[in-house]
Curated annotation (Swiss-Prot):
It comes from Nitrosomonas europaea (strain ATCC 19718 / CIP 103999 / KCTC 2705 / NBRC 14298). This is Probable tetraheme cytochrome c-type. Heme 1 binds at C39, C42, M45, E93. Residues 191-214, 224-233 have a biased composition (Acidic residues). One of its GO terms (molecular function) is metal ion binding. InterPro entries: Cytochrome_c-type_ET (IPR051174), Multihaem_cyt_sf (IPR036280), NapC/NirT_cyt_c_N (IPR005126), NapC/NirT_cytc_sf (IPR038266). Pfam families: Cytochrom_NNT. PROSITE patterns: MULTIHEME_CYTC. Heme 2 binds at C67, C70, H71, H168. Binds 4 heme groups per subunit.
Amino acid sequence: MTRLQKGSIGTLLTGALLGIVLVAVVFGGEAALSTEEFCTSCHSMTYPQAELKQSTHYGALGVNPGCKDCHIPQGIENFHLAVATHAIDGARELYLELVNDYSTLEKFNERRLEMAHDARMNLKKWDSITCRTCHKKPAPPGESAQAEHKKMETEGATCIDCHQNLVHEEVPMTDLNASIAQGKLVLKPEDDGDDEEADEDEDEETEEADDSSDSESASSSDNSDNEDDNNDE
């Protein structure tokens, strides 16, 4: 074996060793960054953690999900999404943790809607893959719910388009399709149901007022007739 051949083999072995080390560092680092202990090492994340443990998603059927189960895509096929999430979103949130004051829940709530929307947009981008990890082919009861689920096939909707505010403190729902189209946070319009109920209540009050007015008029007329009869007598 010539010196050149020995050098080539040495280079290949060195490259392979470095590759193994790099893969171990990347996968090990990703696993470490996905732990709940790491997520909640930032003070601001202690608030969502407490909300998670009080939600219906925690403890049901003996399942205790952590931050990563909803916010980080799992599985080797989604590893690139997990790395990108930590690299981009993680860096941004670390910066915001340093420049913002999250010392109280009230201060945290000032950015809650923005943070919730960012998380929703991630789920939208991933086709709610972390939801589907647990909720496999959901078949909701009732025609109305089944019709809504059809939107996932016909309108490009995904779980997070409708199922918001399930775990953390409630904030206004956001229209994710409109947000993507306009490149900014867009709130969902409020339901017309409340307005219709208010209109119905107003109509009922008007009818009651009219009935009351008619009754008073009839009573006044009767009293007037009685007075006339008395005068005639």
